[in-house]
Amino acid sequence: MAHAAAATGALAPLHPLLRCTSRHLCASASPRAGLCLHHHRRRRRSSRRTKLAVRAMAPTLSSSSTAAAAPPGLKEGIAGLYDESSGVWESIWGEHMHHGFYDAGEAASMSDHRRAQIRMIEESLAFAAVPDDAEKKPKSVVDVGCGIGGSSRYLANKYGAQCYGITLSPVQAERGNALAAEQGLSDKVSFQVGDALEQPFPDGQFDLVWSMESGEHMPDKRQFVSELARVAAPGARIIIVTWCHRNLEPSEESLKPDELNLLKRICDAYYLPDWCSPSDYVKIAESLSLEDIRTADWSENVAPFWPAVIKSALTWKGLTSLLRSGWKTIRGAMVMPLMIEGYKKGLIKFTIITCRKPETTQ
């Protein structure tokens, strides 16, 4: 009994997650209720503060969501979050720290979810028309925001390519290199701490530039895409899979106050700067003279994934792992219901953007 009481007390910080998540899981049975990971509850802002937030967060191409200096402590916060949480994720979900891709309405088991994460990689490559043939397949790949390197190792095995990953998290870089060694890929794959806005690579080095769910962390979206283009070789394909907010209607100057408030609460937990829309990314790519620009909304295709993440967090293994990891990870787990809400409202869009760097002028 004493042990049970102690365990119950230790789980007290997660009681709000348990209450909120049970409600949202019931409401998210529809495959249209796509999901993601983020934020703890806060009191409502006054109407005056909400108006200020509208002005501060208006996500237009000229706003801070597409061109801004990093807020103080942002990089350190991102690094700390992933230093703390990556081990928890790997212990439950494995080496791929991104969504899975599913057919609409598909029901899936845990093994299906892991296959769906691989499918996300393959669907992204197919959408970008990355060639498989020996002459044209990628030989050199950069993985920007690499996590613990799951995508890099997969691409190295698939193409025989040299893959280089960067992350703000020293823990992730170290773990990625350790996994590469375990899998016999140390000669093909390497990871280092690096800033996506100032990549430690020369111009034109890579014929595939890959960013799987890291763009949402970038305070300056234009600089982010510009750096992806800089390190791309002439003719190289650039793939960005990221979280966006919905496109604005022609009559709108910004998102609605309640939408901005929801995103702000998510940002606070996940060390995210202001969000932007898919159309913002298209405008940035066009302004950089990138070619073959394509986008798609895959929100419905990721719908089954986050209900499974939530359920795994509510297992004994998940709950005890969260408690051992630290407050940043717990706070992130507590915002999952807000991400569910954002997807259900059509506010959050799981987006792929692909483009190509022009060939060298003859």
From Swiss-Prot:
Enzyme class: transferase
Region feature (SAM motif I): 141-150
Annotated stretches, region: SAM motif II: 204-212
Transit peptide: 1-55
Protein location: Plastid, Chloroplast
Region of interest (SAM motif III), residue spans: 231-240
GO molecular function, one term: S-adenosylmethionine-dependent methyltransferase activity
GO biological process, one term: vitamin E biosynthetic process
UniProt KW keywords: Chloroplast, Methyltransferase, Plastid, S-adenosyl-L-methionine, Transferase, Transit peptide
Enzyme Commission number(s): 2.1.1.95
Pathway in which this enzyme or protein is active: Cofactor biosynthesis; tocopherol biosynthesis
InterPro entries assigned: Methyltransf_11, MTs_g-TMT, SAM-dependent_MTases_sf
Catalytic activity: gamma-tocopherol + S-adenosyl-L-methionine = (+)-alpha-tocopherol + S-adenosyl-L-homocysteine + H(+); delta-tocotrienol + S-adenosyl-L-methionine = beta-tocotrienol + S-adenosyl-L-homocysteine + H(+); gamma-tocotrienol + S-adenosyl-L-methionine = alpha-tocotrienol + S-adenosyl-L-homocysteine + H(+); delta-tocopherol + S-adenosyl-L-methionine = beta-tocopherol + S-adenosyl-L-homocysteine + H(+)
Protein name per Swiss-Prot or TrEMBL: Probable tocopherol O-methyltransferase, chloroplastic
